[in-house]
Protein backbone atom coordinates (compact mmCIF):
# COMPACT_ATOMS: atom_id res chain seq x y z
CA UNK A 1 0.00 0.00 0.00
CA UNK A 2 1.35 3.45 -0.84
CA UNK A 3 0.63 6.92 0.49
CA UNK A 4 -1.25 9.28 -1.75
CA UNK A 5 -0.09 12.86 -1.50
CA UNK A 6 -3.31 13.85 0.22
CA UNK A 7 -3.03 11.07 2.81
CA UNK A 8 0.63 11.82 3.30
CA UNK A 9 -0.05 15.47 4.00
CA UNK A 10 -2.90 14.62 6.38
CA UNK A 11 -0.88 11.97 8.19
CA UNK A 12 2.17 14.15 8.54
CA UNK A 13 0.15 17.13 9.72
CA UNK A 14 -1.52 14.96 12.33
CA UNK A 15 1.78 13.56 13.47
CA UNK A 16 3.30 16.98 13.93
CA UNK A 17 0.32 18.61 15.59
CA UNK A 18 -0.78 15.78 17.81
CA UNK A 19 1.95 14.37 19.93
CA UNK A 20 5.41 13.55 20.97
CA UNK A 21 7.48 10.46 20.79
CA UNK A 22 6.22 7.41 22.53
CA UNK A 23 7.23 3.82 22.28
CA UNK A 24 9.90 3.67 19.60
CA UNK A 25 12.62 1.20 20.45
CA UNK A 26 15.84 2.39 21.98
CA UNK A 27 17.76 -0.31 20.14
CA UNK A 28 19.60 1.66 17.47
CA UNK A 29 20.23 -1.37 15.31
CA UNK A 30 16.51 -2.00 14.91
CA UNK A 31 15.91 1.07 12.74
CA UNK A 32 14.27 0.14 9.43
CA UNK A 33 16.24 0.55 6.24
CA UNK A 34 13.56 2.87 4.86
CA UNK A 35 11.92 4.85 7.68
CA UNK A 36 8.17 5.06 7.20
CA UNK A 37 6.03 8.12 7.76
CA UNK A 38 3.90 7.39 10.79
CA UNK A 39 2.13 9.47 13.41
CA UNK A 40 4.10 10.16 16.57
CA UNK A 41 2.54 8.76 19.72
CA UNK A 42 2.84 9.83 23.32
CA UNK A 43 1.63 12.36 25.85
CA UNK A 44 3.79 15.42 25.25
CA UNK A 45 3.28 17.82 22.37
CA UNK A 46 6.07 19.82 20.81
CA UNK A 47 4.50 23.05 22.05
CA UNK A 48 4.53 21.65 25.58
CA UNK A 49 8.21 20.84 25.21
CA UNK A 50 8.91 24.41 24.11
CA UNK A 51 6.87 25.89 26.97
CA UNK A 52 8.66 23.78 29.55
CA UNK A 53 12.02 24.67 28.03
CA UNK A 54 11.15 28.37 28.24
CA UNK A 55 10.28 28.04 31.92
CA UNK A 56 13.59 26.30 32.62
CA UNK A 57 15.97 28.31 30.47
CA UNK A 58 15.09 32.00 30.86
CA UNK A 59 17.24 34.16 30.97
CA UNK A 60 19.75 31.97 29.11
CA UNK A 61 17.26 31.28 26.33
CA UNK A 62 13.78 32.68 25.77
CA UNK A 63 12.67 29.97 23.29
CA UNK A 64 11.49 32.59 20.82
CA UNK A 65 8.94 31.69 18.10
CA UNK A 66 11.78 32.00 15.58
CA UNK A 67 15.37 31.40 16.68
CA UNK A 68 16.95 34.05 14.46
CA UNK A 69 19.46 35.90 16.63
CA UNK A 70 17.18 38.89 17.16
CA UNK A 71 15.66 38.00 20.54
CA UNK A 72 16.68 39.00 24.07
CA UNK A 73 19.76 36.74 23.80
CA UNK A 74 21.63 39.15 21.50
CA UNK A 75 25.27 39.32 22.60
CA UNK A 76 24.85 36.74 25.36
CA UNK A 77 27.98 34.60 25.16
CA UNK A 78 28.15 32.55 27.38
CA UNK A 79 24.49 31.83 26.87
CA UNK A 80 22.53 31.17 23.69
CA UNK A 81 23.16 34.36 21.76
CA UNK A 82 25.70 35.39 19.18
CA UNK A 83 28.83 37.50 19.60
CA UNK A 84 28.49 41.26 19.57
CA UNK A 85 25.29 42.35 17.87
CA UNK A 86 24.63 38.71 16.86
CA UNK A 87 25.05 39.52 13.17
CA UNK A 88 26.74 36.17 12.46
CA UNK A 89 23.85 34.35 14.13
CA UNK A 90 21.36 36.46 12.17
CA UNK A 91 23.26 35.87 8.94
CA UNK A 92 22.84 32.11 9.39
CA UNK A 93 19.09 32.49 9.70
CA UNK A 94 18.73 35.04 6.91
CA UNK A 95 20.93 33.21 4.39
CA UNK A 96 19.05 29.94 4.93
CA UNK A 97 15.65 31.64 4.77
CA UNK A 98 16.64 33.23 1.45
CA UNK A 99 17.13 29.80 -0.15
CA UNK A 100 13.86 28.64 -1.70
CA UNK A 101 12.60 25.17 -2.63
CA UNK A 102 11.40 24.44 -6.15
CA UNK A 103 8.08 22.62 -5.99
CA UNK A 104 7.80 19.49 -8.12
CA UNK A 105 4.40 17.85 -8.33
CA UNK A 106 4.72 15.48 -11.30
CA UNK A 107 6.66 12.41 -10.20
CA UNK A 108 6.24 8.84 -8.93
CA UNK A 109 7.65 9.14 -5.39
CA UNK A 110 5.29 7.87 -2.68
CA UNK A 111 7.35 6.82 0.36
CA UNK A 112 10.77 8.52 0.54
CA UNK A 113 13.81 7.13 2.31
CA UNK A 114 15.28 9.80 4.60
CA UNK A 115 18.13 7.63 5.87
CA UNK A 116 21.83 8.06 5.09
CA UNK A 117 25.11 6.31 5.81
CA UNK A 118 27.35 8.15 8.26
CA UNK A 119 30.80 6.57 8.13
CA UNK A 120 29.39 3.05 8.19
CA UNK A 121 26.49 3.73 10.56
CA UNK A 122 23.01 4.00 9.10
CA UNK A 123 21.02 6.89 10.56
CA UNK A 124 17.40 7.79 9.99
CA UNK A 125 18.02 11.21 8.44
CA UNK A 126 20.85 13.62 7.60
CA UNK A 127 20.57 15.37 10.97
CA UNK A 128 22.81 14.80 14.01
CA UNK A 129 22.94 16.66 17.31
CA UNK A 130 25.71 19.25 17.36
CA UNK A 131 28.24 18.78 20.17
CA UNK A 132 27.19 21.30 22.82
CA UNK A 133 28.91 21.94 26.14
CA UNK A 134 28.42 24.30 29.03
CA UNK A 135 25.41 22.93 30.90
CA UNK A 136 26.26 25.45 33.62
CA UNK A 137 27.65 28.56 31.95
CA UNK A 138 25.65 28.32 28.69
CA UNK A 139 22.44 26.61 29.78
CA UNK A 140 21.99 27.77 33.36
CA UNK A 141 22.71 24.52 35.20
CA UNK A 142 19.13 23.22 35.14
CA UNK A 143 20.24 19.75 34.01
CA UNK A 144 23.12 17.70 35.37
CA UNK A 145 25.79 16.45 32.97
CA UNK A 146 24.29 12.95 33.12
CA UNK A 147 20.76 14.21 32.51
CA UNK A 148 21.88 16.25 29.51
CA UNK A 149 23.83 13.40 27.89
CA UNK A 150 20.95 10.99 28.50
CA UNK A 151 18.51 13.47 26.98
CA UNK A 152 20.54 14.33 23.87
CA UNK A 153 22.02 10.92 23.10
CA UNK A 154 19.09 8.85 24.33
CA UNK A 155 16.57 10.96 22.44
CA UNK A 156 18.55 11.06 19.21
CA UNK A 157 19.12 7.31 19.30
CA UNK A 158 15.40 6.72 19.86
CA UNK A 159 14.79 8.67 16.67
CA UNK A 160 17.43 6.65 14.84
CA UNK A 161 20.14 9.26 14.60
CA UNK A 162 23.30 10.16 16.52
CA UNK A 163 23.71 12.16 19.69
CA UNK A 164 26.78 14.16 20.59
CA UNK A 165 29.14 14.78 23.49
CA UNK A 166 31.19 17.97 23.73
CA UNK A 167 34.50 18.98 25.21
CA UNK A 168 33.28 22.37 26.40
CA UNK A 169 35.71 25.25 26.26
CA UNK A 170 34.99 26.19 29.87
CA UNK A 171 34.82 22.61 31.13
CA UNK A 172 37.62 20.77 32.93
CA UNK A 173 38.72 17.33 31.75
CA UNK A 174 36.73 15.69 34.55
CA UNK A 175 33.45 16.98 33.08
CA UNK A 176 34.34 15.64 29.63
CA UNK A 177 35.18 12.26 31.18
CA UNK A 178 31.84 12.23 33.01
CA UNK A 179 29.97 12.83 29.75
CA UNK A 180 31.82 10.01 28.02
CA UNK A 181 31.20 7.69 30.95
CA UNK A 182 27.45 8.29 30.70
CA UNK A 183 27.59 7.64 26.97
CA UNK A 184 29.55 4.42 27.49
CA UNK A 185 27.31 3.11 30.28
CA UNK A 186 24.22 3.34 28.09
CA UNK A 187 25.83 2.30 24.83
CA UNK A 188 24.73 5.46 23.04
CA UNK A 189 25.71 6.06 19.43
CA UNK A 190 27.24 9.52 19.20
CA UNK A 191 29.91 11.81 17.83
CA UNK A 192 32.32 13.83 19.95
CA UNK A 193 33.30 17.46 19.50
CA UNK A 194 36.72 18.61 20.70
CA UNK A 195 38.25 22.06 21.13
CA UNK A 196 41.55 23.13 19.49
CA UNK A 197 43.61 22.62 22.61
CA UNK A 198 47.31 21.81 22.70
CA UNK A 199 48.06 18.79 20.52
CA UNK A 200 48.74 16.49 23.46
CA UNK A 201 45.49 17.51 25.15
CA UNK A 202 43.46 16.86 22.00
CA UNK A 203 45.06 13.46 21.51
CA UNK A 204 44.36 12.56 25.14
CA UNK A 205 40.70 13.38 24.60
CA UNK A 206 40.68 11.44 21.33
CA UNK A 207 41.80 8.32 23.19
CA UNK A 208 39.04 8.72 25.76
CA UNK A 209 36.48 9.11 22.98
CA UNK A 210 37.75 5.99 21.22
CA UNK A 211 37.38 3.99 24.43
CA UNK A 212 33.77 5.18 24.71
CA UNK A 213 32.95 3.74 21.27
CA UNK A 214 32.04 6.94 19.47
CA UNK A 215 31.41 7.09 15.71
CA UNK A 216 33.41 10.16 14.61
CA UNK A 217 35.31 13.17 15.94
CA UNK A 218 35.03 16.86 15.17
CA UNK A 219 37.44 19.62 16.19
CA UNK A 220 36.11 23.18 16.43
CA UNK A 221 39.01 25.01 14.83
CA UNK A 222 37.13 28.31 15.17
CA UNK A 223 37.09 27.98 18.96
CA UNK A 224 40.68 29.20 18.91
CA UNK A 225 39.10 32.65 18.95
CA UNK A 226 37.54 31.98 22.34
CA UNK A 227 40.77 31.64 24.32
CA UNK A 228 39.55 34.05 27.00
CA UNK A 229 36.83 31.56 27.95
CA UNK A 230 39.04 28.49 28.24
CA UNK A 231 39.39 27.00 31.71
CA UNK A 232 42.35 28.41 33.61
CA UNK A 233 45.47 26.41 32.89
CA UNK A 234 44.13 25.12 29.56
CA UNK A 235 44.98 26.47 26.12
CA UNK A 236 43.10 26.73 22.83
CA UNK A 237 45.01 27.82 19.75
CA UNK A 238 44.90 28.15 15.96
CA UNK A 239 46.24 25.10 14.13
CA UNK A 240 48.79 24.97 11.34
CA UNK A 241 48.52 22.67 8.35
CA UNK A 242 51.15 20.37 9.87
CA UNK A 243 49.20 20.20 13.12
CA UNK A 244 46.06 19.24 11.23
CA UNK A 245 47.92 16.37 9.57
CA UNK A 246 49.22 15.21 12.96
CA UNK A 247 45.70 15.14 14.39
CA UNK A 248 44.33 13.19 11.42
CA UNK A 249 47.01 10.54 11.94
CA UNK A 250 46.45 10.43 15.70
CA UNK A 251 43.15 8.55 15.51
CA UNK A 252 41.66 5.77 13.41
CA UNK A 253 38.26 7.40 13.76
CA UNK A 254 36.89 9.71 11.06
CA UNK A 255 38.00 13.26 11.90
CA UNK A 256 36.10 16.31 10.65
CA UNK A 257 37.41 19.85 11.03
CA UNK A 258 34.67 22.25 12.06
CA UNK A 259 34.51 25.99 11.54
CA UNK A 260 35.34 25.98 7.82
CA UNK A 261 33.89 29.00 6.01
CA UNK A 262 36.03 29.38 2.87
CA UNK A 263 36.86 27.13 -0.10
CA UNK A 264 40.62 27.47 0.39
CA UNK A 265 40.49 26.22 3.99
CA UNK A 266 38.24 23.36 2.92
CA UNK A 267 40.96 22.38 0.46
CA UNK A 268 43.60 22.57 3.21
CA UNK A 269 41.57 20.19 5.36
CA UNK A 270 41.26 17.72 2.49
CA UNK A 271 45.00 17.88 1.83
CA UNK A 272 45.62 17.26 5.53
CA UNK A 273 43.70 14.01 5.20
CA UNK A 274 40.49 14.95 7.01
CA UNK A 275 37.53 12.61 6.56
CA UNK A 276 35.31 15.65 6.35
CA UNK A 277 34.61 19.26 7.19
CA UNK A 278 31.82 21.11 8.97
CA UNK A 279 30.85 24.41 7.38
CA UNK A 280 30.10 26.48 10.46
CA UNK A 281 30.51 29.89 12.05
CA UNK A 282 29.83 28.34 15.46
CA UNK A 283 26.30 29.69 15.51
CA UNK A 284 27.69 33.22 15.25
CA UNK A 285 29.37 32.72 18.62
CA UNK A 286 33.06 33.17 17.76
CA UNK A 287 33.15 36.11 15.33
CA UNK A 288 30.39 38.68 15.16
CA UNK A 289 30.31 39.53 11.47
CA UNK A 290 30.67 36.33 9.48
CA UNK A 291 28.47 35.46 6.52
CA UNK A 292 25.79 32.85 7.02
CA UNK A 293 26.67 29.23 6.38
CA UNK A 294 24.06 28.89 3.62
CA UNK A 295 25.75 31.78 1.81
CA UNK A 296 29.15 30.06 1.68
CA UNK A 297 28.19 26.38 1.48
CA UNK A 298 27.66 26.03 -2.31
CA UNK A 299 31.11 27.38 -3.23
CA UNK A 300 32.78 25.25 -0.57
CA UNK A 301 31.00 22.17 -1.91
CA UNK A 302 32.14 23.06 -5.42
CA UNK A 303 35.74 23.25 -4.20
CA UNK A 304 35.53 19.99 -2.28
CA UNK A 305 34.04 18.26 -5.34
CA UNK A 306 33.20 15.05 -3.48
CA UNK A 307 36.66 14.57 -1.97
CA UNK A 308 35.39 14.53 1.62
CA UNK A 309 32.22 14.36 3.70
CA UNK A 310 30.61 17.79 4.06
CA UNK A 311 28.49 18.77 7.05
CA UNK A 312 26.92 22.12 7.87
CA UNK A 313 25.13 23.80 10.75
CA UNK A 314 23.24 27.05 11.19
CA UNK A 315 19.71 27.62 12.57
CA UNK A 316 18.22 24.28 11.52
CA UNK A 317 14.67 24.19 12.83
CA UNK A 318 12.63 22.30 10.22
CA UNK A 319 12.89 19.43 7.80
CA UNK A 320 12.76 21.89 4.92
CA UNK A 321 15.93 23.49 6.31
CA UNK A 322 17.61 20.10 6.08
CA UNK A 323 16.52 19.66 2.47
CA UNK A 324 17.88 23.10 1.58
CA UNK A 325 21.32 22.34 3.02
CA UNK A 326 21.43 18.90 1.39
CA UNK A 327 20.33 20.35 -1.95
CA UNK A 328 23.21 22.82 -1.75
CA UNK A 329 25.62 19.91 -1.37
CA UNK A 330 25.89 18.98 2.31
CA UNK A 331 25.99 15.27 3.11
CA UNK A 332 24.62 15.78 6.62
CA UNK A 333 23.68 18.56 9.04
CA UNK A 334 24.16 19.44 12.70
CA UNK A 335 21.41 20.98 14.83
CA UNK A 336 22.37 22.64 18.11
CA UNK A 337 20.15 25.13 19.92
CA UNK A 338 16.87 23.36 19.11
CA UNK A 339 18.11 20.03 20.47
CA UNK A 340 19.31 21.72 23.67
CA UNK A 341 15.90 23.32 24.17
CA UNK A 342 14.15 20.01 23.51
CA UNK A 343 16.37 18.35 26.12
CA UNK A 344 15.38 20.93 28.72
CA UNK A 345 11.71 20.79 27.79
CA UNK A 346 11.25 17.04 27.60
CA UNK A 347 14.53 15.21 28.23
CA UNK A 348 15.02 12.22 25.88
CA UNK A 349 11.37 12.22 24.78
CA UNK A 350 11.56 15.91 23.93
CA UNK A 351 14.72 15.39 21.90
CA UNK A 352 13.23 12.41 20.07
CA UNK A 353 10.08 14.41 19.38
CA UNK A 354 12.06 17.24 17.79
CA UNK A 355 14.18 14.78 15.78
CA UNK A 356 11.12 12.89 14.51
CA UNK A 357 9.40 16.18 13.73
CA UNK A 358 12.30 17.16 11.47
CA UNK A 359 12.38 13.71 9.87
CA UNK A 360 8.66 13.81 9.06
CA UNK A 361 8.95 17.33 7.67
CA UNK A 362 11.90 16.27 5.51
CA UNK A 363 9.92 13.29 4.22
CA UNK A 364 6.96 15.49 3.33
CA UNK A 365 9.23 17.93 1.51
CA UNK A 366 10.89 15.08 -0.39
CA UNK A 367 7.73 13.36 -1.58
CA UNK A 368 5.19 16.16 -1.89
CA UNK A 369 7.29 19.13 -2.88
CA UNK A 370 10.47 18.04 -4.63
CA UNK A 371 10.01 14.44 -5.74
CA UNK A 372 13.14 12.96 -4.18
CA UNK A 373 12.97 9.21 -3.49
CA UNK A 374 16.12 9.18 -1.35
CA UNK A 375 18.43 11.75 0.21
CA UNK A 376 20.97 11.11 -2.55
CA UNK A 377 18.36 12.30 -5.05
CA UNK A 378 18.16 15.77 -3.50
CA UNK A 379 20.13 18.19 -5.69
CA UNK A 380 20.57 21.84 -6.61
CA UNK A 381 17.81 21.80 -9.18
CA UNK A 382 15.45 21.66 -6.20
CA UNK A 383 16.52 25.01 -4.73
CA UNK A 384 16.87 28.63 -5.72
CA UNK A 385 20.12 30.01 -4.27
CA UNK A 386 20.43 33.82 -4.20
CA UNK A 387 23.52 35.31 -5.86
CA UNK A 388 25.04 31.92 -6.66
CA UNK A 389 26.75 31.20 -9.97
CA UNK A 390 28.54 27.91 -10.55
Model-assigned labels for residue ranges:
Residues 2, 7-29:
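N-terminal export signals
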Residues 36-124, 378, 387-389:
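An N-cap/entry alpha-helix motif that binds or orients negatively charged groups
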Residues 86-172, 179:
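N-terminal functional module of multi-domain proteins
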Residues 129, 156, 219, 277, ...:
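Conserved, mostly hydrophobic/aromatic
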Residues 133-143, 193-199, 256-259:
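Active-site mouth loops of central-metabolism enzymes
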Residues 199-310, 328-330:
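Alpha/beta enzyme core
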Residues 293-299, 343-363:
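C-terminal helical cap(s) of enzyme catalytic domains, especially alpha/beta-barrels
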Amino acid sequence: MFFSRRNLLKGSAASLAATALGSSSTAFAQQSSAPTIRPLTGKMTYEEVRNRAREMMIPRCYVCPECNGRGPCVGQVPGFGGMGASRGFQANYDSLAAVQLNSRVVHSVHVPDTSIDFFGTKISMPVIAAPTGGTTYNMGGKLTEEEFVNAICGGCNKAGTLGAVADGIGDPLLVYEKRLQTLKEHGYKAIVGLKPRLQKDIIERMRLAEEAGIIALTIDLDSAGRAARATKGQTVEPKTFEQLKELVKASKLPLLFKGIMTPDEAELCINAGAAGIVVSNHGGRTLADTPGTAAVLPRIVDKVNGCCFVMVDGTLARGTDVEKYVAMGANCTLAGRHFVRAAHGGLADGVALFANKMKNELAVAMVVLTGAQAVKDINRSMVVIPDYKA
